[in-house]
Every structure is written in C-alpha cells, then in structure tokens.
Amino acid sequence: MSLSDFNQGIYLVITTEVDKKNASKLADLLLREKLIPCVTFKNVESHFWWKGEINQSKEVQLMIKCKEENVNKVRNKISEWHSYELPEIIYFRVSANKNYHQWVNSI
C-alpha cells in the first residue's frame, strides 16, 4: 500500500435504530449492496429533545465503517430505509492501521 492509498479515506458513520431488528435490517441492506465492509452494534440509552419534550429511549447504535467513495451512498440509504422520522446520521473521516485501512477500501 502506497501513501497515495491513504488518500482514499475511511469513514465512520454513526446512527441509532429503535431496536436490534431494525438495526439488523439496515446493516444487512448496506452489507448486501457492498457499501460497507462491517458494522458494529451497541445498546445505548439516548436522552433528547423531540417535539417540545425531553425524551429518553433505549436504542441500538450502529457504528458503520465505509470507504470514502461510499459515504454519501451510505448516508442516502440510511435516510431512505431508517425507521425514524429524523434519523441521526453522524459521519467523519477516521484513521486506522494500514491493514484495516486496506481491508475497508477493498470492499
């Protein structure tokens, strides 16, 4: 892997879903379309303002890894298939070790 290969960044995209079933559906869609190489689930509790009230909810957080050229497609698929009216979609470029970087960009 040359230095120029690291210019093809990798992104971490974070979203939450209402439950494991919906999180799995979204993950499977992204994986089947080969937009991502992997996704990690974590149970979380969110506290937030929604429609003028403070709410709290148990959710499943998805930590989605993808190559730079797919980040917009991933964001669009999340928006299209998400169960929430206003899904959380946070994304940022990340650094990774050489072998992991290469693997993410190979998918």
PLM regions with names:
Residues M1-I107:
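Positively charged, small/polar-rich N-terminal and surface patches that mediate targeting and assembly
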